[in-house]
A protein has these predicted regions:
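N-terminal pre-catalytic "stem/leader" segment of glycosyltransferase-like enzymes
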Residues: 1-49, 215-220, 226-235, 241-243, ...
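Extended catalytic core of nucleotide-activated donor transferases of GT-like folds
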Residues: 17-97
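Hydrophobic beta-strand scaffold residues
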Residues: 63, 161, 182, 212-213
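Conserved catalytic-core segment of nucleotide-activated headgroup transferases in glycan assembly
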Residues: 95, 104, 108-174
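Conserved donor-binding/catalytic loop of nucleotide-activated donor transferases
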Residues: 176-177, 201-210, 215-216, 226, ...
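Acidic donor-binding loop of glycosyltransferase active sites
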Residues: 176-192, 210
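Nucleotide-sugar-dependent
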Residues: 185-199, 217, 221-222
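Conserved donor-nucleotide binding/catalytic region of nucleotide-linked donor-dependent transferases
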Residues: 245-265, 285-293
Length: 305
């Protein structure tokens, strides 16, 4: 939905459903019947599990795969460009489809995180004077280690730990009121057999001035540097985690990245930067169409080995 919303600021954009009909959006079968191939539209598919079927239905039309998670196991036909949301995913397709056109546009943070996040600024101003939550954990994607071992041990040490599992009206406010944010998704994604496609929550935490303890699996390694922007969770022993997290609660400023480091990281994740990158890619895709490089059936298109 974010992709459709932001692309609509660059080109006329329509969201199309393909599993169920909707009163709010066109249905794929109807659109394909009304517009003979190849048509004038550029199609973008993104839901990994359905990509092979979607590409088959769109054969003969210009189509782009916006790739989030990797590891689904399918291959791509020649002539289908990939726009990866992480360098981790870019490398995956650079290996599996080296002759397909490859691009990289990381996901964007919503403006509310950049505008309202209470991180220390370059002028040493902190918009938050009170952070009553010592440690924030979001239950979804969290590992059994975090939920069953680390959280109880932190609570036993007297720390106030918030485990968020339901709907929250204002996530920015929740993060702004937290000193530490824990994110450990490696086990979650391993159990699903695919990679962490991007990982926005750690960036959201940094935008709100939280000290970040995180895993570094898959796309998280794109943006997080151990000991600089984030600290490894599950580092060796439970006791080691307890000592480090307790120290960060006692003195968060000693564990935060430099304000300039955070701002540089967040600037690269803004919607403005996203739109600029996509605008450049759309121009390149137009060139590819003119050169016949986006035809899945053309004999001229290079095949990946």
């Amino acid at each position: 939905l974010q992709t459709a919303r932001l692309l609509s600021t660059l080109r006329p954009t329509e969201l199309v459903t393909y599993r169920e009909r909707s009163d709010d959006h066109p249905y794929l079968d109807d659109v394909l019947q009304a517009e003979p191939s190849p048509g004038r539209s550029l199609w973008i598919v993104s839901w990994g599990f359905d990509v092979p079927r979607s590409l088959a239905r769109l054969q003969g039309r210009p189509v782009v795969y916006q790739a989030h998670s990797s590891g689904y196991g399918f291959g791509l036909p020649p002539g289908v460009p990939v726009v990866a949301v992480s360098r981790n995913t870019l490398g995956y397709w650079g290996d599996r489809a080296p002759r397909n056109p490859l691009f990289w546009v990381p996901n964007a943070l919503e403006p509310q995180w950049l505008e309202r996040g209470a991180r220390p600024s370059l002028s040493d101003r902190d918009a938050v004077t009170e952070r009553p939550i010592d440690v924030l954990v979001q239950k979804r994607k969290s590992s059994p280690y975090v939920l069953e071992q680390l959280v109880p041990a932190l609570q036993a040490k007297g720390l106030r730990v918030e485990v968020q599992s339901g709907w929250v009206d204002d996530l920015v406010d929740l993060f702004n009121r937290s000193k530490i944010y824990l994110y450990d998704s490696a086990e979650y994604w391993r159990g699903r057999g695919v990679s962490e496609g991007f990982g926005l929550p750690p960036l959201e935490a940094l935008a709100c001035g939280c000290v970040l303890f995180s895993s570094f699996n898959h796309a998280l390694a794109d943006t997080l540097t151990p000991g600089v922007t984030a600290h490894q969770i599950g580092q060796g022993t439970l006791d080691n985690d307890l000592v480090r997290i307790s120290a960060a609660v006692a003195s968060p400023s000693q564990w935060l990245p430099a304000p300039s480091t955070i701002e540089e990281l967040l600037a690269d994740s803004s919607e403005a930067q996203w739109c600029e990158r996509w605008n450049e890619i759309l121009a390149q895709l137009n060139d590819l169409v003119r050169h016949g490089a986006m035809s899945q059936m053309s004999d001229m298109v290079l095949r990946s080995p």
